[in-house]
Structure formats: structure tokens, C-alpha cells
């Protein structure tokens, strides 16, 4: 079955809404945070059964072990032991972000090109690139990307698109936008030949230009996509993100779920959920955890600071996550980080993921009570 989306409550205070997405592998209560499991695994988190939707990267899974190999083993759900919804990207995001950086990295660096030259050529057919693992030459077209995602068997899939950095040349930006929408139409056409249980979101580009964002919305709205994903360059800071998301969401129909690609840190979620965004994906909680940044109700906690060296409080008093409930103290966690124990990142990741799910429950409650 393709997904079904139901709006359960529309806030009286904003465009925020509480909804439910139904897929063949279960329900997703929205707004939802969607952690990124790059290679089919959430770094430092062993149990993902309580995570409603997980984001896996097609590019990395194509490179190893291969989409066909995963299909032969029963698909991605069977391969990673997950009986809950999965979303996969097209592979394009990873290819271009390896060259230009991710959306989050772009905001920090204003889109300075990264050192690795993995892209060989981009044309209307698709993108030629080198494997980041062994340097072998690979090719990704809209049809190849969608077939790979069908082999993986994710519940929600995305069309191939080109991710451009904030500093892209205006002429090339226009060419890229036109090519991206051709790729998306080809992706959708290929998907609709055999949709099965999968659903496809259309990706809206347009950079920081309101008129281009509106054109992107019209393109996606005019085609039978199952949902909308706000992608592409979102600017250089949170203010830009808010402006881009606000304009884009205002030009989308309420009937389809809306996903914000590559943005899922707490300040951005709080700043944009009022526009009616239904899901946010990011590797932020686990990446922050591996660097000793602990998410708490009182704000981020830098566990490596000397002040926690003899702090015998739980990571966060009152927290019910596995780390806190097992008595992992701030002093002990700091010690684990200082001696480079792998357990440090694991405990921190478990806590951070639990915190994100807690925040999303609070957000849904706030919308239901018309406070957000």
C-alpha cells in the first residue's frame, strides 16, 4: 500500500498540525524527527524499534553491499532487522554533498567546495561519479536510482535531484533546476510503473529565491507525488532557513505530508514546525553525541568540561532513557570520553535520541493544545 496521511489536528495558533502517516510497515505520528542511518545503522544506537521513521542513504548502500545484494536478502527491512517505516534518498544528495558539503555544513561554511573530487560529470542523463570507498567509476540516472530504492524496499523514496551549494553560479543554478525537475519526472514515471507498497515524495528546489521556490512547489503539486520534501540550498543561517521554509510551505497543499530534508537540529525544528512541517531528518543528535554534546531540557551540555569531572548526577535528572535509568553519571560519561572509550558515544547517542523523541512528543502535545 502507498502511504495514507491524515491530519488529526490543525493548530489555531499557526500552520502547525498533528498528523499520522500510515505505511505498510507501520504508523508515523507527526511532526516526527527522522534520524539518519547512513549505512543502515544509527551510529551508537543499537535499538531503533521505538523510532517511528528512519532515513537510510541509498548512495552508501549502493556502494556497499549493493542494492541488488540487499534485495536478494529480502530487502532493507529484513537486512537490518527493522519492522517499521524507512525512507531512502535518491543517492544524489550524498554524491553532491561529498563534493560541496551537506545542507548543515553549507550553512556553516557558506558552501565552500570540499576537497574530494568525487563527481566526474553531470549531464541530462545523470551523474557520473567515483566511489568514495575504492575510486571505481559509477553512474546514477533517475531510473537507476529509483530501481535501487525499489531493491532496498523503503516505504518512502525520493527522486534523483541535484544539490547545489549556496554560492552556485546563477546561470548554472537555472540549468540545474531545470535538469532536476526533468530527473524528478523521470523518477516518478519509473516509480509509477510498479509502485508496490512504496510512496514517492517530490523534492522542491529553488534556493533562497521565493519565485523559484513557488515554481518548485507548482511542479511538485501538479504531479501525483505522495508527499513533498523541501530540499536544495536553504541559505546560510537559521533566518534564511525560516524564510525559505515559510515561503515554500505556504505554497503546498495541506493534504500531502511535508518533509524538511537535512535539517533536524532543535533550533531549526522549533523555528519551522509552525509552518506545517511534518518530518525532519538529520544526523545531528548522534553526531553531537559522538563529540560530547549532550541534549537536555536545559539546553546542550558539553560533557567534556571540567565542571562535570566529579558530577555524580545522572546525565539528565528525571530522564528515562537507558543511559540515565542505568545510572550513568555525568562524571563517568566524561571519563569515558576522556579515555576514548567507544561506550562514551554509545551512551551519549542513546540519551540524545531519547531526548529528540521526547521533544517531538512535547511538540505534538503543544500543537494539540494550540500552544504552537
From Swiss-Prot:
**Quaternary structure, from the entry:** Homodimer. Within each dimer, one monomer is responsible for RNA recognition and catalysis, while the other monomer binds to the replacement base PreQ1.
Record-stated family: Belongs to the queuine tRNA-ribosyltransferase family.
What's its job?
Catalyzes the base-exchange of a guanine (G) residue with the queuine precursor 7-aminomethyl-7-deazaguanine (PreQ1) at position 34 (anticodon wobble position) in tRNAs with GU(N) anticodons (tRNA-Asp, -Asn, -His and -Tyr). Catalysis occurs through a double-displacement mechanism. The nucleophile active site attacks the C1' of nucleotide 34 to detach the guanine base from the RNA, forming a covalent enzyme-RNA intermediate. The proton acceptor active site deprotonates the incoming PreQ1, allowing a nucleophilic attack on the C1' of the ribose to form the product.
Reported EC number(s) for this entry are: 2.4.2.29
> Which residues are involved in binding substrate?
89-93, 161, 232
**Known catalytic reactions:** 7-aminomethyl-7-carbaguanine + guanosine(34) in tRNA = 7-aminomethyl-7-carbaguanosine(34) in tRNA + guanine
Name the keywords, alphabetized. Answer: Glycosyltransferase, Metal-binding, Queuosine biosynthesis, Transferase, tRNA processing, Zinc
Which co-factor is required?
Answer: Zn(2+)
Q: Where is the active site?
A: 89, 281
Gene that produces this protein: tgt
Q: HAMAP family, from UniProt?
A: Q_tRNA_Tgt
Q: What's the protein called, per UniProt?
A: Queuine tRNA-ribosyltransferase
Q: Which residues bind Zn(2+)?
A: 319, 321, 324, 351
UniProt keyword annotation of Metal-binding present: yes
The record, for Gene3D superfamilies, names:
Queuine tRNA-ribosyltransferase-like (3.20.20.105)
Pathway membership: tRNA modification; tRNA-queuosine biosynthesis
Q: Which PANTHER family match?
A: PTHR43468, TRNA-GUANOSINE(34) QUEUINE TRANSGLYCOSYLASE (PTHR43468:SF1)
One GO term of the biological process aspect: tRNA-guanine transglycosylation
Amino acid at each position: 500500500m502507498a502511504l495514507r496521511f491524515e491530519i488529526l489536528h490543525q493548530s489555531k495558533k499557526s500552520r502547525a498540525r498533528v498528523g499520522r502517516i500510515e505505511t505498510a510497515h507501520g504508523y508515523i505520528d507527526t511532526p516526527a524527527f527522522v534520524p539518519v542511518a547512513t549505512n543502515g545503522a544509527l551510529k551508537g544506537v543499537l535499538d531503533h524499534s521505538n523510532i517511528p521513521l528512519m532515513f537510510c542513504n541509498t548512495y552508501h548502500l549502493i556502494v556497499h553491499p549493493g542494492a541488488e545484494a540487499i534485495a536478494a536478502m529480502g530487502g532493507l527491512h529484513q537486512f537490518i532487522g527493522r519492522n517499521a517505516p524507512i525512507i531512502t534518498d535518491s543517492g544524489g544528495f550524498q554524491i553532491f554533498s561529498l563534493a560541496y558539503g551537506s545542507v548543515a555544513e553549507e550553512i556553516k561554511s557558506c558552501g565552500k567546495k570540499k576537497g574530494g573530487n568525487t563527481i566526474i560529470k553531470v549531464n541530462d542523463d545523470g551523474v557520473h561519479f567515483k566511489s568514495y570507498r575504492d575510486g571505481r567509476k559509477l553512474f546514477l540516472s533517475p531510473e537507476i536510482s529509483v530501481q535501487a530504492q525499489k531493491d532496498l524496499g523503503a516505504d518512502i523514496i525520493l527522486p534523483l535531484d541535484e544539490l547545489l551549494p549556496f554560492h552556485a553560479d546563477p546561470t548554472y543554478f537555472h540549468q540545474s533546476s531545470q535538469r532536476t525537475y526533468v530527473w524528478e519526472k523521470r523518477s516518478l514515471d519509473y516509480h509509477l510503473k510498479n509502485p508496490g507498497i512504496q510512496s514517492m515524495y517530490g523534492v522542491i528546489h529553488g534556493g533562497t529565491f521565493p519565485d523559484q521556490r513557488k515554481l518548485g512547489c507548482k511542479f511538485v503539486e501538479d504531479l501525483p507525488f505522495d508527499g513533498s520534501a523541501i530540499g536544495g540550498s536553504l541559505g546560510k543561517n537559521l533566518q534564511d532557513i525560516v524564510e525559505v521554509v515559510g515561503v515554500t510551505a505556504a505554497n503546498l497543499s495541506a493534504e500531502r505530508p511535508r518533509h524538511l530534508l537535512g535539517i533536524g537540529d532543535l533550533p531549526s525544528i522549533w523555528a519551522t514546525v509552525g509552518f506545517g512541517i511534518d518530518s525532519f531528518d538529520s544526523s545531528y543528535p548522534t553526531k553531537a553525541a559522538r563529540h560530547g554534546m549532550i541534549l537536555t531540557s536545559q539546553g546542550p551540555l558539553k560533557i567534556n568540561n571540567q565542571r562535570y569531572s566529579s558530577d555524580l548526577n545522572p546525565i539528565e535528572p528525571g530522564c528515562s532513557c537507558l543511559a540515565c535509568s542505568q545510572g550513568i553519571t555525568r562524571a563517568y560519561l566524561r571519563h569515558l570520553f576522556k579515555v576514548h572509550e567507544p561506550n562514551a558515544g554509545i551512551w551519549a547517542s542513546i540519551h540524545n535520541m531519547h531526548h529528540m523523541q521526547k521533544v517531538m512528543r512535547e511538540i505534538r502535545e503543544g500543537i494539540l493544545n494550540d500552544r504552537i
